[in-house]
UniProtKB/Swiss-Prot annotation:
GO terms for molecular function: calcium ion binding. Its main location: cytoplasm. The keyword tRNA-binding does not apply. One of its GO terms (cellular component) is transport vesicle membrane. This is Secretagogin. The gene is SCGN. Residues 12-47, 58-93, 105-140, 149-184, 197-232, 240-276 form the EF-hand domain. The lineage of its organism: Eukaryota, Metazoa, Chordata, Craniata, Vertebrata. Ca(2+) 5 binds at D254, N256, D258, K260, E265.
Amino acid sequence: MDSACKPTQRRLDAAGFWQIWQRFDADEKGYIEEKELDAFFHHVLTKLGTDDAVMEENVWKMKQQFMAAHDVSKDGHIQMKELACLFLSEDENFLLLFRQETPLDSSVEFMQIWRKYDADSSGFISAAELCNFLRDLFLHHKKAISEAKLEEYTGTMMKIFDKNKDGRLDLNDLARILALQENFLLQFKMDACSTEERKRDFEKIFAHYDVSKTGALEGPEVDGFVKDMMELVQPSISGVDLDKFREILLRHCDVNKDGKIQKSELALCLGLKINP
């Protein structure tokens, strides 16, 4: 925890903090403006049960404490982690912010995680499967946690990220938890360039998804490519949809039926002729 960050005596949980944060950062930029601080602290203190009679005084004190401890950037942006550590315990802080510290580089990495924890291949992550994910996450970061706390944090994560409140997480919910980087394919415009440029772009695209460097896309590499490709035309796809699109792609591209997509097979699917 930042040494300049001294938590207040009264604490929120991660779900409570997230609920307030979203009011001010609705489009999830990851920061709020300095001019919003008073209103933000007012919401926090209201949630913590502060008496109206001392509200303004406490908001002022809290703002002074915060401004003394933090060097607000010239653009007036205040990051979520700067405020979270004032109101959350260390574990709750970690739960909310670990995704900002370790964002995923590619959809292939994301799909490896999705396939591992969607153990029953239902196309959703259940609370029990999310609990397994969090257990591994805490172990990976060398943080000890009891089973009781783990269950509590699983409930917190479901509260924060289960958008439609159906008791399970879909592909998009997990992508939000893991702070997946921007779709790799967005940088390419395959319909607006020459054949040579398309070939060059194809080489870059294939190299990006062929993480294992085998010359063929398989398993989560196919998943990652399908996810990014479909999200170019359909911004939000479910795990069930992804499996359908994956099956269609393999049916069309996997000429030798080995369950993989060779480089030459994908080129053929995209109408390109490449050197062997």
